[in-house]
Amino acid sequence: MPHQKEAIAKLLPTRVGALFMDMGTGKTRTAIELVKLRQKKISKVLWFCPVSLKETIRQEILKHTTCSAEDIYTFGDKTASNAIPNATWYIIGLESISQSDRVALAAHSLFDSDTFVVVDESSYIKGHRAKRTERLTQYARGCKYRLIMTGTPITQGIQDLYAQMKFLSPKILGYNSFYSFAANHLEYHKKRRGLIVRAHNEAYIAARIRPYVYQVTKEECLTLPSKLYDVRYFYMTEQQREAYEEAKLEFLSKLEYDSEWSAIDIFQLFTSLQSIVCGFWNRNGQMCSIPHRRLERLLEVVRDIPEEEKIVVWAKYQFSIREIAKALRAKYGARAVAEFHGENERSRDNELARFKHDAKTKFLVATQSCGGYGLTLTEARYAIFYADSFKYGDRLQAEDRCHRIGQTNPVTYISLYCLHSIDERIEKALDKKGDALAAFREEVEKVKQTNKTKIRELVMAL
């Protein structure tokens, strides 16, 4: 496509570059073409991507190159340095670089000056102190060619760019450490350590990265069918309301001992409240189910969708995945439901293939954390969000699994929200393309500066 040719023309003269292309605009194909054009100058390709995408990337390489299956080696959990076959393409899970020393060491043994390194979904290395970021940046330092790619390079602020650009080259931004970068571009809260309140000199950063970045939005380069939205509401049961209020009171009791809340505290509060409106509560390590109406509402929505349509159901919690899958199988049969979640890659890949190719597999039940990045699910034009992420970026990523190149029909997204609950705050934040956690934390900070006693009212209003 024209925009892919533009990307190649811009980045081919440089040894390092970034494809900041919207989801569904063909980043993977563009990256593969860049590799092919440099194949005489490199000995191998190390392609790092989310674990859930490894099989997708393998299929794309087979589709768009002359490589055979033997030319591609996909790292697994048990891959070790002394058992890596010779290959041209190596596909490695990003999560494994931080979670498995064995895999990290095995990957490290493959880096040399003639290696082309691709980091697919480079938002995974935006944390400058994260183990995977530090390892990959160090490993790739001597590699001649480096490419990063993501549709969401910035989710929190310009600080997200630092580590991604440093991976390519510290010379791009001109700072040898995050602290020198922060001193010139970030303003921190005077009392809340680490809380960024303002960014400065953004034009300087934009100018520094411009020669190395190709950026395009879906609206600029594609004519895709429209997105359609629908919302279905429901109320809590009495048991849910009782647990919901109890969870808020337990959280507030902490104020008696510690008036300072961290982002983790607020995350735990939001997670507890959201889990309750999803029908369970992990209270002090004890899991208990609670009667609820969310699953009933889901089944009502499914009944309204034409029988021949495939449907993606996005859930957030493993409890919900099990409950949804059980209910759908009971009504539509065991073969009708595929699940995409958990750590078993082979199982995930098999389930995904079944959803894509088996006409009798109507549902794909997946978590946004596992399936929300990189997958192509254009077989479905209906997606139901059983429970939403707190972040707009996660929601957008999940939406664009169905709404991308290859989709020829309008895609309908149906959200399930519980009235008079945390769901309403999440819905409001997502409508504003924001972060529900960050928005609540800002409210807490404002209240604390005026009247700390109002914090209780703020929490009880959730």
Task: Please identify what each model-predicted range represents.
Residues 73-80, 93-99, 126-129, 315-319, ...:
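Conserved helicase motor
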Residues 98-100, 156-158, 321-325, 348-352, ...:
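SF2 helicase motor core recognition
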Residues 53-77, 168-172, 331-334:
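Conserved helix-turn-beta segment of the N-terminal RecA-like "Helicase ATP-binding" lobe
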Residues 43-44, 63, 85-86, 116, ...:
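Conserved P-loop NTPase motor "coupling/switch" region that bridges the ATPase
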Residues 390-462:
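A conserved SF2-helicase RecA2
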Residues 1-20:
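Conserved pre-motif I regulatory segment
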Residues 30, 42-63, 155-160, 316-318:
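Conserved Walker A/P-loop ATP-binding site and its immediately adjacent core
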Residues 13-16, 25-26, 30-43, 223-245, ...:
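Conserved Helicase C-terminal RecA-like lobe
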